[in-house]
Each structure stands twice: as structure tokens, then as C-alpha cells.
Amino acid sequence: MPYRVILTADAAQDFRALDHSVKEQVARQLRKLETSPQLGEHLGRKGELDLTGYHKLYAAKRAIRIVYRILEVEVVVEVIAIGKREDLAVYREAARRIMRPE
């Protein structure tokens, strides 16, 4: 059964902000998650950031990171953040979004 890939509102905004060619590469990676959600690497602690339970997937020659989690009960891959790794920026943003009250 294929997974449904959903982007949080913030991740959708990240996606819209990408250049066209990068957007195509990210979209290609997101489509792969539909059939292979375990494709990305497990994240744990990144410095002071605890991203245990989340995964990362590379795009655009490893310049872009996609941070996501797998929701097995719903058969969903939820994308939390998309962005550059520079100074752990995408991981900091993902952690901030995870910790933010709904």
C-alpha cells in the first residue's frame, strides 16, 4: 500500500520558496517516499536538537534536506521542513516547528 506524502503548512511554504529546478528534484524525492518511506536516514540528536523519530532525505546534490516522519497508523509521510543544511538551519527549523504548539 503506497504512503500518502503530506507537507505541513510550513513545509509547503518551504517548497514554494525553492527555485524551479530544485523544486523538481525535491518533488522527485517526495514521490519516492510514497513507496519507500524508510529511504531517508534516521535523525537523532543534532547538537542540542532532538529529532529522534524523524528522518532526512537529500535532494539537489545533497544541498537540500527534507525532514519528515512516518505515521504508520495513517500510512502517511509527514514532511516537516525542507531547506539547506548550512549551520543545521533546516534541523533547527524542524525542531522549532515540532516544539511549537498546534
Place the predicted regions along the sequence by residue.
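Charged, low-complexity, helix/coiled-coil-prone segments
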Residues: 2-13, 35-43, 100-102
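Generic secondary-structure microfeatures
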Residues: 19-22, 30, 34-37, 61, ...
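Arg/Lys-rich, positively charged N-terminal/basic patches that mediate binding to nucleic acids
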Residues: 1-31
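Enriched for short, Lys/Arg-rich terminal
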Residues: 2-4, 17, 58-65, 69-102
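A short, surface-exposed loop/turn module that caps and links secondary-structure elements
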Residues: 31-59
